[in-house]
């Protein structure tokens, strides 16, 4: 009987027959994003598209979302390459056996969102025309993407004088372990100093958008000299026994804001949410707040952002 023998030979052949370059790429393959530092690091499918991007500040290749046991040397192991330059970025995707590129300059960007939910992460540039530029990756690469995030944020620093500082009685205390850690992370890694200007702890009884009883997940607004930072848990409420693992950080440069509005909720026994709308041309960033975010409204007014009804 030779069934097992023929299977073993076939299993070993795919590695022996692969080129050294394909074996090297296969051996390094995993769920993480790699920084491309030499032409040999560039996936074959992307080499023509990447030819003009080797001077990028960040040149990152994202793997396919596939089990390692299902891939072999020579397969297309990478689905996207992100090139971040001083004046903008390019996202190259492999679709239908060809590479499609999307280019963005910083003046087209309205806001940036960094989203994580366990092992799934998403990096989104919200564009002024209402569109979005999305790059998905595994959370194991959060450190590298955090560096890319800080670089993008540094592109909208204006280097002029910010509005006058907040009064001493406007200091906001963040009394929540999760949000305290998020604040510490922003202070440690961000390109500019930040201060909390509005904070709502998680765990408050409230009503959700459908007027059902729920528990709030909390929100924190941070003020930096050139940007407003919103830290939330993706959705404003959870069910009573629901676990929430997601976190979203949204970075909105003050200079790009064209208007803001606050929709107040009807009065009822259980609190309902205010809806803060930040507009950057056709792009809108919305955030639910159980309490009127007076500190945020004051900062927006100080920057001269017009309020609409």
Which functions belong to the PLM regions below?
Residues 61-69, 85-107:
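Short N-terminal edge-element motif at the start of the domain
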Residues 1-79, 86, 117-226, 231-309:
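Intrinsic disorder/low-complexity detector
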């Amino acid at each position: 009987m030779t069934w097992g023998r023929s299977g073993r030979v076939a299993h070993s052949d795919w590695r022996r027959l692969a080129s050294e370059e394909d074996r090297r790429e296969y051996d390094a393959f995993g769920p993480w994003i790699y920084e491309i530092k030499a032409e040999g690091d560039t996936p074959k499918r992307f080499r023509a598209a990447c030819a003009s991007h080797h001077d990028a500040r960040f040149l990152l290749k994202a793997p396919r979302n596939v089990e390692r046991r299902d891939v072999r040397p020579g397969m297309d192991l990478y689905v996207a390459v992100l090139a971040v330059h001083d004046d903008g970025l390019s996202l190259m995707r492999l679709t239908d056996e060809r590479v499609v590129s999307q280019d963005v300059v910083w003046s087209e960007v309205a806001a940036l969102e960094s989203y994580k939910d366990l092992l799934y992460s998403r990096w989104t540039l919200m564009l002024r025309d209402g569109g979005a530029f999305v790059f998905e990756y595994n959370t194991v690469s959060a450190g590298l993407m955090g560096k890319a995030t800080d670089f993008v944020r540094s592109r909208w620093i204006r280097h002029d004088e910010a509005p006058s500082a907040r009064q001493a009685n406007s200091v906001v205390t963040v009394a929540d372990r999760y949000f305290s850690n998020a604040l510490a992370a922003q202070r440690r890694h961000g390109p500019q100093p930040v201060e909390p200007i509005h904070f709502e702890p998680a765990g408050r009884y409230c009503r959700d958008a459908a007027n059902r009883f729920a528990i709030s997940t909390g929100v924190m607004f941070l003020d930096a000299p050139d940007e407003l930072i919103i830290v939330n848990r993706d959705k404003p409420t959870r069910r009573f026994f629901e676990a929430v693992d997601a976190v979203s950080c949204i970075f909105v440069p003050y200079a790009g804001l064209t208007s803001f509005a606050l929709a107040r909720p009807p009065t009822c026994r259980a609190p309902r949410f205010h809806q803060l709308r930040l507009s950057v041309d056709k792009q809108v960033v919305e955030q639910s707040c159980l309490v009127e975010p007076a500190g945020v409204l004051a900062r927006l007014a100080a920057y001269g952002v017009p309020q609409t009804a």
